[in-house]
Amino acid sequence: MKKEHVSHCQFSAWYPLFRSLTIKSVILPLPQNVKDYLLDDGTLVVSGREDPPTCSQSDSGNEAEETQWSDDESTATLTAPEFPEFNTQVQEAINSLGGSVFPKLNWSAPRDAYWIAMNSSLKCKTLSDIFLLFKSSDFITHDFTQPFIHCTDDSPDPCIEYELVLRKWCELIPGAEFRCFVKENKLIGISQRDYTQYYDHISKQKEEICRCIQDFFKEHLQYKFLDEDFVFDIYRDSRGKVWLIDFNPFGEVTDSLLFTWEELTSENNLRGEVTEGDAQEQDSPAFRCTNSEVTVQPSPYLSFGLPKDFVDLSTGEDAHKLIDFLKLKRNEQEDD
């Protein structure tokens, strides 16, 4: 994977070419002062939020108690920076897209920060909603600081013009999303995107799903993207129509889901792993999905919202911690 491959997967690089195949979006240049604010690792103070209501006369009885929590009357009040011009641009764009948007940077969306939002969703209606997600996201920080970390070439990093991408909010069903892997302009693999869950309809319709995705790829994407190796995400709606969601580089920076990158780069284990209906076709992609509830896994974003020890206990990944936890509970019961 080279740096130019990563650059070609920036939203603004591919959206003009495939606008008719995807969700309506608006791209706004990200001012330098906004970027600096998003990268500031100080206390999270979100711009654009209303001040909390002041205490009324009826609350005066709590004044003494509240005063005790103040270390120093001269303590500085944290204030959020304001970006009035940018805020106006963002709000106009949000309104033009129906009032709610899905935000992302050049490459990534703050999927790892959904837990911090009031609605536990990436649905945003204001700039402050976006700031809260962006400042809480490791994925966004990666876009800013290490976009070319897995690239093999030693050439200077391309100059990046950072952009805020606002996509019209659509209620997408996770079980209808798929990730597709293309090598040398050939579709070699398709994976269920939400691989942590079992969806009965995917197992029952996998031949039809695979055929729809192949037809979409051959008609709209094959030999038309900027590179011959790439990854693309699609959404198949209830009518069977396929929508393009995103492009990603063909390499370790992209989650391979139910495949491994060793399999995808060598293709050795993909031969013969075709759907039954396409068994005679040499170029049929391997199709993988979660086949039963037994193979359901924890969400990959779980670790971003909870302490690691909690995650290890809940998933059973650290046997020693689990044993210690059980011993602690037993001792507590004996003490009682």
UniProtKB/Swiss-Prot annotation:
Region annotation Disordered: where it falls in the sequence: 48-73
Subcellular location as annotated: Cytoplasm
Keyword Zinc-finger: no
Composition bias type Acidic residues, residue spans: 62-73
Keywords recorded for this protein, A-Z: ATP-binding, Chaperone, Cytoplasm, Magnesium, Metal-binding, Nucleotide-binding, Phosphoprotein
BP terms from Gene Ontology: eukaryotic translation initiation factor 2 complex assembly
Binding site for Mg(2+): 246, 248
PTM annotation, UniProt: Phosphorylated.
GO molecular function: ATP binding; magnesium ion binding; protein folding chaperone
Domain of life of the native organism: Eukaryota
GO CC annotation, single: cytoplasm
Modification Phosphoserine occurs at: 60
Binding site for ATP: 104, 107, 109, 111, 167-170, 177, 179, 193, 233, 246, 248
Subunit architecture: Interacts with the eIF2 complex gamma subunit EIF2S3 (via C-terminus); the interaction is direct. Interacts with the eIF2 complex alpha subunit EIF2S1. Interacts with the eIF2 complex beta subunit EIF2S2.
Stated family: Belongs to the CDC123 family.
Function: ATP-dependent protein-folding chaperone for the eIF2 complex. Binds to the gamma subunit of the eIF2 complex which allows the subunit to assemble with the alpha and beta subunits.
Protein name: Translation initiation factor eIF2 assembly protein
